[in-house]
């Protein structure tokens, strides 16, 4: 019986070069990032002492914590809802297979700008513009999330099956009808999934933007940290973790229902 030997696949020079570039970037970034793993191990005792100050959590003001957590959720709800509404037209206008280049290129750059700036930066700007409070947080999440969802929606639109759209076009439908009956039904499950995920992310982001005065539990958390009230800080962190975990569970069930 003749033995057939299969030669191993040859590594392309491009693949080897790519790995070399990745390794070089990691090496160069080591110094810039001031990586110090040995210091982390050396100061482990101090970190353990610091961590012990967080226990037991102080839930004595739990009613105030729940009130601020509710405000944080409301900030995330409105920031996400407004972004979902606006991301649909912007996402469609960012899709290369729906509109000409002179439409999608400017819209993409606008969405890049919304996405490139962190929510914290937007929150600081809106705190100056509209004052302290939850509304500044809503606007910050709204702008950033619009950029993210528009990007995700445009990629989903560009990956749709052209058959249904062509079939609707063959009936004499106009462009709007093609989008309503051929495009949106294909991407709507993904849009719902992306929106639920961004809502989870926005709850966490709403906590952070609160630290710069944009309302919610972030304000209380920052005051506890700044006042070295670590047991209260731990209680607030536990509440945030439990809330995000519950939202993750609920959104997972909803995603299974829609997809």
From Swiss-Prot:
<dbReference type="GO" id="GO:0005886">
    <property type="term" value="C:plasma membrane"/>
</dbReference>
<comment type="subunit">
    <text>The complex is composed of two ATP-binding proteins (PhnC), two transmembrane proteins (PhnE) and a solute-binding protein (PhnD).</text>
</comment>
<dbReference type="Pfam" id="PF00528">
    <property type="entry name" value="BPD_transp_1"/>
</dbReference>
<keyword id="KW-1133">Transmembrane helix</keyword>
<feature type="transmembrane region" description="Helical">
    <location>
        <begin position="205"/>
        <end position="225"/>
    </location>
</feature>
<feature type="transmembrane region" description="Helical">
    <location>
        <begin position="13"/>
        <end position="33"/>
    </location>
</feature>
<keyword id="KW-0812">Transmembrane</keyword>
<comment type="similarity">
    <text>Belongs to the binding-protein-dependent transport system permease family.</text>
</comment>
<keyword id="KW-1003">Cell membrane</keyword>
<feature type="transmembrane region" description="Helical">
    <location>
        <begin position="123"/>
        <end position="143"/>
    </location>
</feature>
<comment type="function">
    <text>Part of the binding-protein-dependent transport system for phosphonates; probably responsible for the translocation of the substrate across the membrane.</text>
</comment>
<protein>
    <recommendedName>
        <fullName>Phosphonate transport system permease protein PhnE</fullName>
    </recommendedName>
</protein>
<dbReference type="InterPro" id="IPR035906">
    <property type="entry name" value="MetI-like_sf"/>
</dbReference>
<feature type="transmembrane region" description="Helical">
    <location>
        <begin position="176"/>
        <end position="196"/>
    </location>
</feature>
<keyword id="KW-0472">Membrane</keyword>
<feature type="transmembrane region" description="Helical">
    <location>
        <begin position="75"/>
        <end position="95"/>
    </location>
</feature>
<dbReference type="GO" id="GO:0015416">
    <property type="term" value="F:ABC-type phosphonate transporter activity"/>
</dbReference>
<keyword id="KW-0813">Transport</keyword>
<dbReference type="InterPro" id="IPR000515">
    <property type="entry name" value="MetI-like"/>
</dbReference>
<feature type="domain" description="ABC transmembrane type-1">
    <location>
        <begin position="69"/>
        <end position="251"/>
    </location>
</feature>
<keyword id="KW-0997">Cell inner membrane</keyword>
<feature type="transmembrane region" description="Helical">
    <location>
        <begin position="230"/>
        <end position="250"/>
    </location>
</feature>
<dbReference type="InterPro" id="IPR005769">
    <property type="entry name" value="PhnE/PtxC"/>
</dbReference>
């Amino acid at each position: 019986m003749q033995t057939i030997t299969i030669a191993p696949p040859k590594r392309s020079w491009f693949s080897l070069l790519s790995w070399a570039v990745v390794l070089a970037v990691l090496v160069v970034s080591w110094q810039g990032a001031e990586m110090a793993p040995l210091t982390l191990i050396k100061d482990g005792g101090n970190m353990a002492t610091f961590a012990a100050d967080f226990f037991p959590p102080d839930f004595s003001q739990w009613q105030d914590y729940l009130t601020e957590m509710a405000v944080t959720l409301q900030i995330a709800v409105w920031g996400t809802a407004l972004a979902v509404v606006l991301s649909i037209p912007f996402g469609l206008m960012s899709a290369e297979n729906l509109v000409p280049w002179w439409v999608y290129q400017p819209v993409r750059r606008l969405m890049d700008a919304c996405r490139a700036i962190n929510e914290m930066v937007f929150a600081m700007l809106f705190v100056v513009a509209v004052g302290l409070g939850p509304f500044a947080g809503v606007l910050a999440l709204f702008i950033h999330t619009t950029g993210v969802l528009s990007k995700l929606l445009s990629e989903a639109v560009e990956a749709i099956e052209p058959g249904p759209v062509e079939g609707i076009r063959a009936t004499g439908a106009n462009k709007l009808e093609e989008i309503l009956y051929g495009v949106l039904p294909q991407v709507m499950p993904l849009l719902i999934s992306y929106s639920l995920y961004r809502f989870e992310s926005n709850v966490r982001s709403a906590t952070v933007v609160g630290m710069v005065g944009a309302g919610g539990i972030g304000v209380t958390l920052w005051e506890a940290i700044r006042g070295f009230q670590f047991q209260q800080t731990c209680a607030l962190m536990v509440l945030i973790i439990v809330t995000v975990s519950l939202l993750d569970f609920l959104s997972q069930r909803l995603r299974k229902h829609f997809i």
